[in-house]
Amino acid sequence: MNDFLPAIYLSFLVALLAGTAIFIVRQILRTRKTESRLSQLQNKLKKEKGTAQEYYELGTLYLDKKLYVQATKLFQKALSTKEEVEPENRALVYNALGFTHFAQQQYDLAVRQYKEALKLNPEYVKALNNLGHVYERKQLVAPALEAYEQSLQYEPNNATAKRRAEALRKRSVTSS
């Protein structure tokens, strides 16, 4: 029995180290891919005008890195390109722009961008959830609840909207 204990311990340790190594290698590969794409887009957009898609993609990469000011500029460029962009895609850009403002605690600007996204795509559930979240941060319970309920009309199983709407209902009942 005592002879197996070190073997079990070593097996466990090797398995743990192998799992950790696999995780680290996957993270490195993912980061390299992201950094490569970031570098590609930066170089291309320095040399020539880009498409709305390229500005949006680079803005999203900056957003992931929490470089909100740079992301905001790129999303604005994506919106100001002269090419014809589908309303659903423009809604994505407005939503991302709203998120950059939200992350910088510029809640009024975030609301404006989310509403622009919803003008272009009224059934855009993510924008409705984001709008509800902004209203919550501004302590505006009624509009927040309305945004979440509207989100649930389009996507009844939306976990975020369900959870936040229920929390707001409980909060409004206890405060009454």
Predicted regions and their residues:
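Terminal, low-structured helical/coil segments at or just beyond the last alpha-helical repeat
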Residues: N2-G19, Q153-S176
